[in-house]
UniProtKB/Swiss-Prot annotation:
Domain of life: Bacteria
HAMAP family hit by this protein: Ribosomal_bL28
Ribonucleoprotein is among the record's keywords: yes
Keywords assigned by UniProt, alphabetized: Ribonucleoprotein, Ribosomal protein
Gene3D superfamilies linked: Ribosomal protein L28/L24
Keyword Ribosomal protein on entry: yes
PANTHER family the record matches: 50S RIBOSOMAL PROTEIN L28 (PTHR39080), LARGE RIBOSOMAL SUBUNIT PROTEIN BL28A (PTHR39080:SF1)
Positions of the UniProt region annotated as Disordered: 1-22
Similarity comment text for this entry: Belongs to the bacterial ribosomal protein bL28 family.
Protein name: Large ribosomal subunit protein bL28
Length: 62
């Protein structure tokens, strides 16, 4: 499965590792993904991967 949030569609970002000598190498900033079970309208449940921020939003608004 892709490293993307199923709700917001956010994916990993790219950036740099910066050493003390200011040498830069490329790196990826990954999401804090969590696997949760979501109840659908027809009564079934489904596992999806969502970011921790979206999980907070779901808990706040439900």
């Amino acid at each position: 499965m892709a490293k993307k949030c199923a709700i917001s569609g956010k994916g990993p970002m790219s950036g740099n590792n910066v050493s003390h000598a200011k040498n830069r190498t490329k790196r990826r900033f990954l999401l804090n993904l969590r696997t949760v079970r979501i109840a659908l309208d027809d009564g079934t449940t489904r596992k999806i991967k969502i970011s921790a921020r979206e999980l907070r939003t779901l808990k706040k608004n439900s």
